[in-house]
């Protein structure tokens, strides 16, 4: 839709008036010129780096702001959304229609009378279920970010484009009435599912737009029987699809970027009758400690049209990827075609036959790989476990566990069991097997090597794990292989990595207790009760 008169009317219907000029679906050339032009100040200013990519700063918010996330409570959402509660806290806090109206007025006022960038794009590679998304912003690099991250429409698709969801990004405005309205702060990321609008105020972080639309796909798709997943995905030469679930830092992007297989996508996917499809048209990779040696694909993708966030740019234009002084969450967004080995022309493939859950276990308890039963698949999917090592004041490094339902609780709009049901149903239809892979630590105190982890992934994907002789691990009742090609056999049973097996037993009992306690939130239903048997025995 390039009729600017009609577009101006549609902006008017959102309360955005007296627009000076609309820059509609700008080209990469124009975006580059706009975000680096002389006279830009503060967080609007982009800096050109020696790799050709533009670097920007997002201010005090260098990550999402989950405490400021709200969804309007109305007839449509009251019985569908997984609302936060005293018993089980989550990020889906209810907002009244009155408060919403006030915030929408604030953002509309901020965007009125300005020169605006409007980007029309798609979220979802399948025509039947994709969301047509319109992003309205006054900031050039935010238009660049969504051009990278969403699916870029053809000229034909832009004719008669009607948005299903509008993102009104008012990063420069804050809410003075937040206290009286009972909100968390002057900043806000709010959704009105009935109106099909997302409002952003006070935060410049690009990921709010990406993950905002992910949360909306997570609302609409499962209600239609389609799995909506926080995972990466790739496909082999024989058309065999694999999906990798995991929280941040567990290896989703690294392990799915594999020279032997084509990348479907690195973060958000759906699974319908036809198969697995990407929601996005780009990647959003972490860049802390990035090197050309360790991650050549991602490093090579950082060139003209890529957009770096919160990195340190030296005076000579080089980027110091080891410098996390602004944030450890330094990022780059780039169009997916910056990666060589991708599925073309549309990021989708057949139904998955291998489902891999990645956990980085800092407790040193979980085996490097276990094959899961259907009940265990549901249990460990709902648990969504990983653990980080955090230094304490006395220099002792203690593991801190994270349980995030479906490996992405922050983005779930419906109750976690709805995602588990749809995933298991899809797996049953395709005959998919599930595996739990620990990319974390063992009894040696060292992290399992990337070489061994890649060997394990290869064994899962080429089917050799299914031919391996299996043993059993007590407490968790995991089925574990005794040997795999190219993998150090001494690590496959975690008990063998301890000088004293009783030490593993003690740690395993502790971790099992944490799993059991976390799973109590699901035991309110008969199905949840039944799944307890698939979990560890503390």
Curated annotation (Swiss-Prot):
ATP binds at residues 211, 230, 246-254, 295, 331, 447-448, 453. Binds 1 Mn(2+) ion per subunit. GO terms for molecular function: ATP binding; metal ion binding; phosphoenolpyruvate carboxykinase (ATP) activity. Keywords: ATP-binding, Cytoplasm, Decarboxylase, Gluconeogenesis, Lyase, Manganese, Metal-binding, Nucleotide-binding. It catalyses: oxaloacetate + ATP = phosphoenolpyruvate + ADP + CO2. Its cofactor is Mn(2+). Mn(2+) binds at residues 211, 230, 267. Its main location: cytoplasm. The keyword Nucleotide-binding applies. Its EC number is 4.1.1.49. InterPro entries: PEP_carboxykinase_ATP, PEP_carboxykinase_C, PEP_carboxykinase_N, PEPCK_ATP_CS. One of its GO terms (biological process) is gluconeogenesis. Substrate binds at residues 64, 205, 211, 331. GO terms for cellular component: cytosol. Pathway: Carbohydrate biosynthesis; gluconeogenesis. It is found in: Cytoplasm. Involved in the gluconeogenesis. Catalyzes the conversion of oxaloacetate (OAA) to phosphoenolpyruvate (PEP) through direct phosphoryl transfer between the nucleoside triphosphate and OAA. Monomer. Belongs to the phosphoenolpyruvate carboxykinase (ATP) family. This is Phosphoenolpyruvate carboxykinase (ATP). It comes from Mannheimia succiniciproducens (strain KCTC 0769BP / MBEL55E). The lineage of its organism: Bacteria, Pseudomonadati, Pseudomonadota, Gammaproteobacteria, Pasteurellales. The gene is pckA.
């Amino acid at each position: 839709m390039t009729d600017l008169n009609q577009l101006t009317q549609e902006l008017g219907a959102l309360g955005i008036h007296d627009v000076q000029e609309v820059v509609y679906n700008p080209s990469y050339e124009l975006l580059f010129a706009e975000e680096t032009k002389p006279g830009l100040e503060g967080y609007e200013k982009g800096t050109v780096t020696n790799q050709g990519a533009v670097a920007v700063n997002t201010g005090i918010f260098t990550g999402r702001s989950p405490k400021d996330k709200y969804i309007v409570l109305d007839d449509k959402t009251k019985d569908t959304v997984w609302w936060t509660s005293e018993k089980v806290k989550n990020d889906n806090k209810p907002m009244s229609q009155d408060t919403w109206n006030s915030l929408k007025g604030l953002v509309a006022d901020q965007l009125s009378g300005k020169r605006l960038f409007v980007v029309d794009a798609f979220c979802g590679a399948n025509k039947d279920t994709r969301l047509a998304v319109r992003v309205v912003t006054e900031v050039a690099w935010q238009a660049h970010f969504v051009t990278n991250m969403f699916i870029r429409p053809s000229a034909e698709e832009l004719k008669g484009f009607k948005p299903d969801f509008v993102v009104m990004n008012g990063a420069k405005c804050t809410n003075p009435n937040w206290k009286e309205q009972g909100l968390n702060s002057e900043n806000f990321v709010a959704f009105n599912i009935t109106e099909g609008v997302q409002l952003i105020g006070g935060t410049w972080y690009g990921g709010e737009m990406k993950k905002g639309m992910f949360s909306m796909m997570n609302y609409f798709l499962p209600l239609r029987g389609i799995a909506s997943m926080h995972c990466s995905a790739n496909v082999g030469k024989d058309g065999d699809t694999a999906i990798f679930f995991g929280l941040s830092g567990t290896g989703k992007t690294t392990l799915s970027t594999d020279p032997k297989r084509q990348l479907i996508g690195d973060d958000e996917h759906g699974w319908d009758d036809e198969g697995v499809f990407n929601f996005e048209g780009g990647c959003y990779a972490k860049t802390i400690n990035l090197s050309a040696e360790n991650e050549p694909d991602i490093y090579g993708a950082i060139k003209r049209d890529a957009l770096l966030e919160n990195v340190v740019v030296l005076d000579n234009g080089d980027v110091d990827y080891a410098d996390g002084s602004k944030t450890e969450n330094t990022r780059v967004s780039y169009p997916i075609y910056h990666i060589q080995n991708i599925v073309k022309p549309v990021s989708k493939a057949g139904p998955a036959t291998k489902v891999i859950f990645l956990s980085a276990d800092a407790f040193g308890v979980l085996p490097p790989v276990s094959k899961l039963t259907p009940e265990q698949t549901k249990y460990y999917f709902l648990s969504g476990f990983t653990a980080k090592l955090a230094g304490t004041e006395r220099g002792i490094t203690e593991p801190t566990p994270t349980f995030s339902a479906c490996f992405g609780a922050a983005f779930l709009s419906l109750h976690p069991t709805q995602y588990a049901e749809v995933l298991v149903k899809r797996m049953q239809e395709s005959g998919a097997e599930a595996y739990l892979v620990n990319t974390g630590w063992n009894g040696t105190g060292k992290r399992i090597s990337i070489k061994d982890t890649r060997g394990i992934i290869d064994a899962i994907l080429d089917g050799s794990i299914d031919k391996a002789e299996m043993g059993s691990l007590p407490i968790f009742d995991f089925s574990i292989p005794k040997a795999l090609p190219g993998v150090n056999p001494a690590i496959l049973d975690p008990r063998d990595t301890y000088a004293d097996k009783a030490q593993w037993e003690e740690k395993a009992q502790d971790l099992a207790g944490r799993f059991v306690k976390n799973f109590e939130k699901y035991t309110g239903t008969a199905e949840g009760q039944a799944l307890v048997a698939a979990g560890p025995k503390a």
